């Protein structure tokens, strides 16, 4: 169990009437501006006055301090120490915004760790009649994996298909299966999302993010810091 008191057989009346931090709300605390120690500690005091048991330090759009920098990590430590002094819980959050995996783009600076997807298209190159901008679209730099001869019946349903060579002529429509690397995005600070099917990519994410949090606050793991969200 995450909280040790959950293993107790009975809930005491005293604990029910005045629950400790484990049994109180812990809101997502949006970090979306320039962060300073004094202001962060002031807000933690307000959380405590409101009856919250802790908080999740959640990076959101607008953060001005450099994510995972020494300055940023010191602020994390300051908040953990403040939570401890207030008898509260400080939950960590492992990403710059969401979803977790790219570490704010630090993981995917290395293109080997960038997300990949399968593109199935009747166009060998991007010569479609209509251009549509999508996040997982055509790059013309994809790796051709296979070609297929796809035959549809008069109602547009699949009649047959078979794999053929790149230079073979198709009886129906020739379709191409490409492995593409996802394009860069401002959401990932000019990088991309990570290839979460790659163990090496996930290991790199853990190294950059979780290990850094462990170095900074590991002495409070399973104490003031119950988990990383």
Model-derived features: positions:
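Mature extracytoplasmic enzyme cores
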Residues: 1-16, 24, 41-50, 68-229
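N-terminal cofactor/phosphate-binding cores enriched in small/glycine residues
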Residues: 27, 33-64
């Amino acid at each position: 169990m995450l909280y040790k008191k959950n293993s107790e057989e009975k809930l005491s009346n005293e604990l029910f009437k005045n629950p400790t931090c484990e049994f109180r709300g812990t809101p997502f605390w949006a970090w979306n501006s320039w962060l300073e120690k004094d202001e962060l500690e002031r807000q933690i005091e307000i959380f405590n006055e409101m009856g919250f048991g802790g908080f999740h330090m959640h990076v959101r759009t607008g953060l001005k301090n450099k994510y995972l920098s020494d300055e940023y990590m010191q602020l994390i430590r300051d908040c953990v120490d403040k939570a401890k002094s207030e008898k509260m819980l400080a939950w960590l959050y492992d990403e710059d915004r969401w979803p977790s995996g790219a570490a704010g783009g630090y993981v995917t600076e290395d293109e080997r760790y960038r997300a990949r997807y399968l593109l199935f298209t009747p166009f060998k190159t991007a010569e479609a009649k209509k251009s549509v901008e999508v996040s997982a679209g055509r790059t013309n730099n994809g790796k051709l994996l296979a070609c297929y001869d796809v035959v549809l019946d008069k109602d547009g349903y699949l009649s047959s298909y078979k794999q053929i060579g790149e230079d073979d002529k198709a009886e129906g429509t020739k379709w191409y299966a490409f492995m593409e690397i996802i394009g860069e995005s401002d959401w990932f600070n000019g990088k991309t999302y990570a290839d979460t099917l790659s163990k090496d990519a996930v290991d790199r994410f853990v190294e950059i993010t979780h290990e850094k949090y462990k170095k900074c606050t590991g002495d409070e793991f399973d104490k003031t810091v119950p988990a990383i969200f």
